[in-house]
């Protein structure tokens, strides 16, 4: 099941994904008004029993509540590319990525969900105001290392879903 909104993200659904009984959740929307293509929530979790190695919170990414953002995400292949990256390419990533507990999409639509590690201890850049010079320099260096991993590798049929310029 792919939830259409945070209201469909239940304790039972999260329990299945995390492999432990989740008894309560507290979703908090994050990233509003900063140019994001989806609705993103930090979901604080409580478990039935003490857990080791399970998160106290996760981030849940869902389709935007704005039709124009959903349409643009589909038209540009953004949602599908993100889900497929986590499911098919993340093991080759040259940089750290969040742990992903679930990434699903109904191909060709805006129906998708990503449940991932909460990295709220890190800084997120506001897309509408931009980066400072040091952040931009760091981003370019990281993008170059990511790009290098797949240099001359994406022109194969199994990677034809990757948008090209």
Regions found by a protein language model. Give the residues of each.
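Conserved ATP-binding subdomain of kinase catalytic cores across diverse folds
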Residues: 28-165
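Juxta-kinase regulatory segment immediately upstream of eukaryotic protein kinase catalytic domains
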Residues: 1-29
